[in-house]
């Protein structure tokens, strides 16, 4: 189980990303439209004023049950430990253990 502070920090980041997403899109479009390099630098300076945690690259996928940040499966939103447990108890529909 991950520390609650890490899970809360990730929730905060997710909220910031959603909040500043529209502003980031506008700035990116302005950079594409800008013709000179100086204009691009000025717009880039505006984007640097935004909070650091509002960048989507700072988000990490976490397990929805345990909060574990490593070894997550995108399809399920679970870490490998929880995925294995739930697959063995038939809690995940359509998931079967392979054998050959």
Curated annotation (Swiss-Prot):
SUPFAM superfamilies attached to this UniProt entry: Glucocorticoid receptor-like (DNA-binding domain) (SSF57716)
Q: Where is the signal peptide?
A: none
Kindly indicate whether the keyword Chloroplast belongs to this entry. yes
Recorded GO MF terms:
rRNA binding; structural constituent of ribosome
The alphabetized UniProt keywords are:
Chloroplast, Plastid, Ribonucleoprotein, Ribosomal protein, RNA-binding, rRNA-binding
Key word Cytoplasm present = no
Write out the annotated subcellular location.
Answer: Plastid, Chloroplast
Q: Which GO terms describe its biological process?
A: translation
Q: What cellular component terms from Gene Ontology apply here?
A: chloroplast; small ribosomal subunit
**InterPro entries referenced in this protein's UniProt entry, alphabetically:** Ribosomal_uS14, Ribosomal_uS14_bac/plastid, Ribosomal_uS14_CS
Per the entry, what this protein does is:
Binds 16S rRNA, required for the assembly of 30S particles.
**NCBIfam families in alphabetical order:** PRK08881.1 (NF006477)
Subunit and interaction comment = Part of the 30S ribosomal subunit.
Which family does the similarity line name? Belongs to the universal ribosomal protein uS14 family.
Protein name, UniProt field: Small ribosomal subunit protein uS14c
Organism equals: Psilotum nudum
């Amino acid at each position: 189980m991950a520390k609650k502070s890490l899970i809360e920090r990730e929730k905060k980041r997710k909220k910031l990303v959603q909040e500043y997403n529209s502003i980031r899109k506008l700035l990116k479009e302005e950079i594409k439209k800008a013709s000179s390099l100086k204009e691009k630098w000025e717009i880039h300076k505006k984007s640097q004023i935004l909070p650091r945690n509002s960048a989507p690259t700072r988000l990490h996928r976490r397990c929805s049950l345990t909060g574990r940040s490593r070894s997550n499966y995108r399809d399920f939103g679970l870490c490998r430990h929880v995925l294995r447990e739930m697959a063995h108890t038939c809690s995940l529909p359509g998931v079967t253990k392979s054998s050959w």
